[in-house]
Amino acid sequence: APGILRAMPRLIFFCGHAGTGKTTLAKRALPALHRATGESFCLLDKDTLYGDYSSAVMGVLTGDPNDRDSPPYLQHLREPEYAGLMKTARENLALGVNCIVVGPLSREVRAHKLTDRAWLGVGDEVQVRIVWVHLPEDEARQRIAARGNPNDAWKLAHWDDYRTRLFMPSAQDHPELLLLDNSEPAERVFETLMTALGG
């Protein structure tokens, strides 16, 4: 309606390697942000959006529907999944809906693409925040094993190959990131997160 002022739409990324707790934090942050701002937020988790589709495709490509880390997956499905994830986010942002996007996005973070508005396809009216959730490698591996997700089977069976893709951004090289150490006490982590996000 005329005269109603709308806040700039927010695009918040929760990134980090598998097992670090990014999805759990994002799901906890969303209702807290809604309560704090009165605004609507859409949760876009790559695994939720593309998990079943990727299972069907990888079952045909490799015979393993749970494969999410092998070279065939990385070659054929990784980029289309992220492209679809970002298209969905842009569609919601254009409608004035804030988006919380959850996915590893490690290549994109390393290359600073999440601050490249041309790559994101968003204008200056969108507020972009990037949270990088991290844990020590051994703790992340323990969490992955404990959660029992079949999609982690290739990762766990080929850990030495998988771990070569792991990287930890530094505050100096990636000042755009909120680096969140999820090995800290849970309430302290969440308080740090919400303070940084303005919730």
Predicted features, each with a name:
Residues F14:
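Hydrophobic anchor at the beta1->P-loop junction of P-loop NTPases
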Residues H17-A18:
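The conserved Walker
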Residues T23:
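Walker A/P-loop
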Residues L30-P80:
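Conserved substrate/cofactor phosphate-moiety recognition/catalytic segment
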Residues Y73-D124:
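Glycine-rich phosphate-binding loop used to anchor ATP phosphates in small-molecule kinases
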Residues G123-I144:
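Conserved phosphate-donor/acceptor-positioning beta-strand/loop module used by diverse small-molecule
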Residues Q142, A146-T192:
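Small-molecule kinase domains that catalyze NTP-dependent phosphoryl transfer to phosphate-bearing small molecules
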